[in-house]
Amino acid sequence: MLSDSDRVRVLSEALPYLQAFAGRTFVVKYGGAAMKEEQLKDSVIRDIVFLSYVGIRPVVVHGGGPEINTWLAKLNIEPQFKNGLRVTDAATMDVVEMVLVGRVNKEIVTLINQAGGQAVGLCGKDGNLIRARAKGEESIGFVGEVQGVDTRVITALVEKGYIPVISSVAADDTGQAYNINADTVAGEIAAALGAEKLILLTDTAGILRDYRDPSTLIYRLDIAEARQLIKDGVVSGGMIPKVTCCVRSLAQGVKAAHIIDGRVPHALLLEIFTDSGIGSMLVGSNAAYDSAFSG
């Protein structure tokens, strides 16, 4: 339990960050264990509402893999994956859209509203927010990628104090629905908005030099270092698309991207408002970030 003096120290440490980030947009990708465990779910929701109350503009993008699998099982549809991507035939696409847009999205909206925020649920189809196209592999079905982002509906909402909650289902020019990786959607939305931060909640501590040893966490790195870690095989497996997504968003103008452990209660606040943080922060260049923050 924190003493009164500890609480004051924490608040004092947070002050420069509160001042620096007021009025800025943060895109938070919400997924993994933080969506499944009630206590973690509650802490994430409270953190998002806190950001809104202190003048930051949070935009939430969510996945929902476990919930999709639950409903596929109920409907006797066997989940299939290829190279880490869900194989999405027509029947599976119907379930994905029903679950992500109709259930998971509305649950998050309800929880934010109950916690004192004002959330509005969206999917990529709303306001032509995300234009999708096929990923180009017929064998994975209706798995898409982002062709373009129209941020007007998001901007209109955040300027009125609402918290957009976005599911990663979008349509192509013919109206065909596609399932798009939620990390990718979050990165592209962050870039299109010119967001201050992209934050990915994951089930790992961040980027580790040795994936078996949490003490090897890399707290900060720039684009060049991130690309080198991928080349050297230090970043591998499921972390590659996450790091690549962060690098792509930084290259398009996002100020910083964070990969943090969503299994830690209040991970968002710990990463944003403490000097040490708890995860990995990626920046375009270390020198430019230091100059911008100190200035």
Swiss-Prot record:
Pathway: Amino-acid biosynthesis; L-arginine biosynthesis; N(2)-acetyl-L-ornithine from L-glutamate: step 2/4
Primary location recorded for the protein, binned into one broad class: cytoplasm
BP term (GO), one: L-arginine biosynthetic process
Record site feature (Transition state stabilizer), residues: 29, 242
Annotated Gene3D superfamilies: Acetylglutamate kinase-like
Pfam families: AA_kinase (PF00696)
This protein's record includes keyword Amino-acid biosynthesis: yes
GO molecular function per UniProt: acetylglutamate kinase activity; ATP binding
Covalent S-S links between cysteines: none
Keywords: Amino-acid biosynthesis, Arginine biosynthesis, ATP-binding, Cytoplasm, Kinase, Nucleotide-binding, Transferase
Domain of life: Bacteria
Record field: catalytic activity: N-acetyl-L-glutamate + ATP = N-acetyl-L-glutamyl 5-phosphate + ADP
NCBIfam families in the cross-refs: argB (TIGR00761)
Function summary: Catalyzes the ATP-dependent phosphorylation of N-acetyl-L-glutamate.
HAMAP family (alphabetical): ArgB (MF_00082)
PANTHER family for the chain: N-ACETYLGLUTAMATE SYNTHASE, N-ACETYLGLUTAMATE SYNTHASE, MITOCHONDRIAL
Record-stated family: Belongs to the acetylglutamate kinase family. ArgB subfamily.
Protein name: Acetylglutamate kinase
Organism this protein belongs to: Thermosynechococcus vestitus (strain NIES-2133 / IAM M-273 / BP-1)
